[in-house]
Amino acid sequence: MAKNVVITGATSGIGEAIARAYLEKGENIVLTGRRTERLEALKTEFAEIFLNQKVWTFPLDVTDMSMVKTVCSDILKTVGQIDILVNNAGLALGLAPYQDYEELDMLTMLDTNVKGLMAVTRCLLPSMVTANQGHIINMGSTAGIYAYAGAAVYSATKAAVKTFSDGLRIDTIATDIKVTTIQPGIVETDFSKVRFHGDEARAATVYQGLEALQAQDIADTVVYVTSQPRRVQITDMTIMANQQATGFMIHRD
């Protein structure tokens, strides 16, 4: 029987790749994200390719707590049991010493990467507890392990994701719910373009001189982690580019 997979931040990059990977595996997917037009475009595209899977779309801004509650309730009413939740929505904004950081950028990262992730989990977790099964994937980052210059807030948010996942695993120990933190290194997506507020030239320098990870690499990892036997729980998975040793210790050609 096909599983029902909810993916936040599914309109591009890693989230979109995860959606495609689960559809290729034969699962049903729930796409959520802020860009309604992109959600509908993906739904149309997927419907033409994956004829036997169900695709639902729900516009969602994870920083809007009221919206999170409403949308999660609608998802449960429409889809039924959720087997896998992929908390992928997240972002970095800016790169500067903490004392010079833009307050709005800081708050947006905290609201999205931490509060939003926790809010979605809080709304969908009770149904998993009732069903005594489920798998929660929380998207962390190597930045949560290795802080680097100019990214104190982003690193802190991703460290929080890791710690939250560990606590959640403890709280659900008496159930068959699994919790995994995925911690990617440098992945070539629109991540840096978003971080630098649309500055494509600056974003491109992040990936120069190295073969960065691709969104598909992370998607394949997520599917692998959630495809293990019931007895196996992979708690953490760290994936870095071959030219990346730690955080921003990178060898560039």
Explain the meaning of each model-derived region:
Residues 58-71, 103:
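The beta1-alpha1 cofactor-binding region of Rossmann-like NAD(H)/NADP(H)-dependent oxidoreductases
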Residues 121, 157:
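Active-site helix of classical SDR
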